Swiss-Prot record:
The modification 6'-bromotryptophan is found at W57. Coiled coil: none annotated. It comes from Conus textile. This is Epsilon-conotoxin TxVA. The cysteine framework is V (CC-CC). Disulfide bonds join C52-C58, C53-C59. Residues 20-50, 64-67 form a propeptide.
Length: 67
C-alpha cells in the first residue's frame, strides 16, 4: 500500500507531460489525418451495415431459413 500514492503521482506526472515527437519529421512521414478519416469512414460503414442487418431488410449475408 505504500507504493500506491507513488504510483498515482507518477501517473499524474506522465499525463501532464508536454507532448512531443521522439523522432524528427522526415520527408517519408505520412500525416495520420487521412488514415484516421479512412478508419472513421470504414467504422461508420460497418455500423450502418450492422444496423441494417439487425432490421433484416438489406443484409446479403443473412442466413437462409428453411434448411
Amino acid at each position: 500500500m505504500r507504493c500506491f500514492p507513488v504510483f498515482i503521482i507518477l501517473l499524474l506526472l506522465i499525463a501532464s507531460a508536454p507532448c512531443f515527437d521522439a523522432r524528427t519529421k522526415t520527408d517519408d512521414d505520412v500525416p495520420l489525418s487521412p488514415l484516421r478519416d479512412n478508419l472513421k469512414r470504414t467504422i461508420r460503414t460497418r455500423l450502418n451495415i450492422r444496423e441494417c442487418c439487425e432490421d433484416g431488410w438489406c443484409c446479403t449475408a443473412a442466413p437462409l431459413t428453411g434448411r
